[in-house]
Amino acid sequence: YVRAINEGNYQAAAELEIARSSFDPFIEQKTSSRVSGYYDGTNLTQRFSNPFEDFNGSVYTEYRISDGDFPVYEADYETLSGGEASVGIAISLLKNRELDKRRTELANAGLATSQWQALATSLINDFVYKGVSEYVAWYESALQVNAVTELLNTATQRERALVTRVEKGDLANVVLTEFKANILQQRLLLAELKQKRDAHAQMLSFYWRSPKGDMLIVDEANPPKDINWPFWVGNGQLMTLRNALRNHPELDVMKLEQQVVNNKAALASNALLPKLDLKASVARDIGSGPSNLDGTETKVGLSFSYPLGNRKAKAEQAQLQSKQRELEHKLTSTEQAITQRFEQALVYWGQAKDIVALQSENAALAKTLSKVEKTRFDAGDSDMFVLNARAQNEIKARIKEIKAKVDLLKAELTLYKEAAMLHSLNN
């Protein structure tokens, strides 16, 4: 998935290079020859042109050579025996002077590259969030399986002791039956937790990859003692995350889109201007021939045009101005939505910390009560119903404690996700 996103960067870079190609120099050649009729003139023209961005300009050099006779209306084709060499420049003075379609496409191609980079950051941020979320979900299930397994092993050992007491006649058989029923409930719970753990492990293998991109098998039964959690949150991190909201990739994409529309709007305004182009050249013929072709020739030309009405440009300008206002409203709405999501995640994180403390205290208390109840039962001061209830409460409290701790990890992860900081940590 990440490799596919990176390919998008290469495609955006290629689009930028395509836009730059509008200013590539080029060579052209034209040949004309009269093959029949009274006149037998032949003309060859070669030109090298090099466009440049300023003033929609272009510089060129040209070489012409002709042979034979031309009619009067084609006298411009005539050159001396060695041909004519010239150099010239063409620029725009009004319309297309400050910008034109090529320069706008080049600017927007650069913005499109930046847009894709911002979008790729957002996509990778979401992808990392999904992968890490799947990891902590597996981690939670695996810890719960281990906790219930540990308590179940203790209960199984106690079952053996109860069997011995029943065989000796110290306890009624119904007491053992009640205890076995409680163990069966614990085994059913363990089976459900293992099913959940294995499902998350299977999903996690999609995100767990080798450096070559191959999926790796997760050891679902052995969670690490320390996952080296990189997304912890403190006061310093909160300040960093909050500041990162101003540079959120979703906002970058929209701001860059605004610049694209602004460029298009400027181009539409440019289309309303009259067209006034200047062309100047210096030419000199070489060799022998008519005297009127000898010497240096300088040419300066102006061309002017303006479409009456120009309804298309005016309509495009109005359309783009409306688009500018639309994007401004969307940007404000997106900024508010990003801030709201972050603040909501912040509230959840604060509550998650309090719940962890309470659930840890509750688990410790449930463990103590279960231990005390076992002592009372062995002394004959309690019955199996109360003992089983204490054991069930201990298991539930332990599971809730694990869930609360993992929920805190999820809350911290969500803060990084909403600030779009997972991508930077992944790098």
Residue spans of the language-model regions?
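Short, solvent-exposed, mixed-charge loop/turn linkers that connect secondary-structure elements
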Residues: D170-A172, A191-T240, D383, K410-N427
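Long, K/E/R/D-enriched contiguous segments that form extended
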Residues: P224-F231, G236-D252, L256-Q259, L267-S281, ...
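Metallo-beta-lactamase
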Residues: L193, P249, A404
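Small/polar, glycine/serine/threonine/aspartate-rich low-complexity segments that form flexible
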Residues: K30-I91, N222-V233, A266, K279-A318, ...
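N-terminal cofactor/phosphate-binding cores enriched in small/glycine residues
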Residues: Y1-K30, R34, D40, R47
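Sec/SRP-type N-terminal targeting helices
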Residues: R3-G8, R20, F55-G82, L94-L119, ...
